Amino acid sequence: MKSKSIMVQGTASSVGKSILCTGLCRVFYKDGYNVNPFKSQNMSLNSAITCDGGEIGRAQYMQAEASNKVPSVKMNPILLKPNSDRGSQVIINGKVFKNMDAVDYYKFKPQLKKDVSKIYNKLSDESDIIVIEGAGSPAEINLNKEDFVNMGMAKIAKSPVILVGDIDKGGVFASIVGTMMLLKEDERKMVRGVIINKFRGSYEILKPGLKMLEDIIKVPVLGVIPYFNLNLEDEDSATDWSKFNFNSKGDIDVAVIKLPHMSNFTDINPLKMYDDVSIRLIEKVEDLKNPNLIIIPGSKNTIKDMEYLKSSGMNSAILNCHSNGSFVFGICGGFQILGSKIKDPNNIESNITSIEGLNLINSVTEIKTDKTTTLTEARDKIFNCNIKGYEIHMGKTLIDDNNSNFLVINSRNEETCNDIDGAISKDKRVFGTYIHGIFDNSEFTRKFLNLIRKNAGMDEIKETPKDYWEFKNEEYDKLADIIRNNVDMKKLYEIVNEGIDETDN
């Protein structure tokens, strides 16, 4: 039996589609439905790994968690990871296909559309309700041919559509009306409701505008969701970076270097659970100052980002901070940057075949053609804590001094192993690892933060915060409550149950 479905599309990127879909998944799950998320094509540098080693968008992973489901590549069959201004690494069904520029990818869309349809139908057979997320805007009229992301996907799924607009940026009425005007007549009929997102102010003042909007587009406004702050992971390329900074009064000043090709910046999210941590996102050398901890995050183009660090002077600033007592922590691409040299003999990332790193760790990385994507379990060699995370990298890093290895890996994708990962500098103030999600591990993170506190002459904090998964579950429940309290759920369920009649499209 095919599932019911509801599709969330937006007037633009970053209007809140991913978060709204996450909340709807949680609502339907809490109401007793077998719910699954789906996004046919995601473009993001933040990804996650499924239990079988497949790579999917971080948003669909989060939506699966909210649905109490094991994340699967069926939830996001196509993932595009930009690695240049005009091209992306194309991942199909969780595995790297190849790098493609926009023109070649556009030619490939007809085949992908067929594949997406088959995968969606398989997921539909396993579900009561599927929450489908669109991408960008359905009004990108130059991309309508062979579309399988927005209205094209709604037609494949025969799904009613909810259109979301972001009022916080201004112009929400124009963006909604303009989007509806640019849709084809059969597509407009599929839009069954509108949600206004990120509202601040008086609802009574807004209310007349909602009525006028309904009169113009002949579609009901199902709800107005207030602007809120929950600690949920963001993956959008149009991320509001101002939200990245956190708790300016924290004892431990953490500076995160904003690399041009930064990826998997969700690694930083768990640090927001710690009251003694302050987080700053650093773009300019003069803003770095002298933090307790510098984090160099993941990168989709490590060599280009190392080149940026040198040209901007950020490399010298990081080295000066380390000389003055700062800890430095590199994750994945950031780990590669910490080393002596990064080699790319096959020009996978750029036309630069070799570049010097920060030389904070005596290591050499070579970019390979094969990609490692694993769920990983390990123990660290300094605190002896269990670590769970995931690896996504195309580099292999060799450490000259084996005694400086950071972690011992005991399983990858549930297969037992005995491998080493990462490195710790001789002064024990530089740490590097390939394992994303390392700060999700509360026991390790608290001990690591206490090491920084001790180095700065501060007392240790004994209390370990709650498990990060427990923390995320609470955030999903709060999100579901926000949706229930601000969206006409009775009307929404009617839309889901009515579906789309074959004659509507």
From Swiss-Prot:
Keywords from the UniProt entry: Cobalamin biosynthesis, Glutamine amidotransferase
Sample GO molecular function, one term: ABC-type vitamin B12 transporter activity
PROSITE patterns: GATASE_COBBQ
Gene3D superfamilies: 3.40.50.880, P-loop containing nucleotide triphosphate hydrolases
Domain of life of the organism encoding this protein: Bacteria
Swiss-Prot/TrEMBL GO biological process terms: cobalamin biosynthetic process
Entry's family note: Belongs to the CobB/CobQ family. CobQ subfamily.
Database matches in Pfam families: CbiA, GATase_3
Xref: PANTHER family: COBYRIC ACID SYNTHASE, DETHIOBIOTIN SYNTHETASE
Pathway annotation: Cofactor biosynthesis; adenosylcobalamin biosynthesis
Active site: 332, 436
Gene transcribed to yield this protein: cobQ
Biological function: Catalyzes amidations at positions B, D, E, and G on adenosylcobyrinic A,C-diamide. NH(2) groups are provided by glutamine, and one molecule of ATP is hydrogenolyzed for each amidation.
Organism: Clostridium novyi (strain NT)
SUPFAM superfamilies: Class I glutamine amidotransferase-like, P-loop containing nucleoside triphosphate hydrolases
Family annotation (NCBIfam families): cobQ, PRK00784.1
All copies of domain GATase cobBQ-type, residue ranges: 251-444
Name of this protein: Cobyric acid synthase
